[in-house]
Amino acid sequence: MKKITVVSLALCSFLFGGDLFSVKAQIPEKFTLPTPWTEEALKAEIPLPEYPRPQMVRSEWLNLNGIWDYMGGKDLLDPVTATTPPVFPAKVEKIRVPYPPESELSGIARGGDTCLWYKRSFSVPQAWKGRHVLLNFGAVDRISSVFVNGKKVGTHTGGYDAFSLNITD
């Protein structure tokens, strides 16, 4: 299996369609606005594990929802001019994807971060060798740049638009 590291930057909220790391996002003990689904969402190893695009159903796919490394702030690398991904600190915040950083379910529970960087590694199954591998984003708000193994593979501009990038070697 080939290990892939994806780094993506989005301005505003980022939603992505993986398996869960052994680390956890910081989840509050008490929620400000709990819903009937809050407890169920917290118990899920992979949040929203169902195939997100029924019109394009696939028998083989990898859900990347779960825990990602997160960096947010106002003074981070700009997605438009970024040619390489940022270096994440050794001790980094964790975010539960697909929830936006403003959501308590994300583990971040704050707004105001204008530049958001997400990072995680995953392995492409050996059975996919020789096939096209697409990275599908369910919704990204504003501007995003996506890096795979340190190489910029694409950018996208739009308001909560879905988009795909071909990351085939």
Each language-model region and where it sits:
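Bacterial N-terminal signal peptides that target proteins for export
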Residues: 1-9
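Generic short amphipathic/hydrophobic targeting helices enriched at N-termini
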Residues: 2-3, 19, 91
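Bacterial N-terminal signal peptides
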Residues: 8-19
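N-terminal accessory segment at the very beginning of proteins
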Residues: 21, 25, 45-50, 103-107, ...
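N-terminal pre-domain segments of enzymes
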Residues: 23-62
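Core domains of carbohydrate- and sulfate-ester-processing enzymes
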Residues: 64-115, 167
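Accessory beta-strand-rich segments of carbohydrate-active enzymes
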Residues: 69-73, 107-169
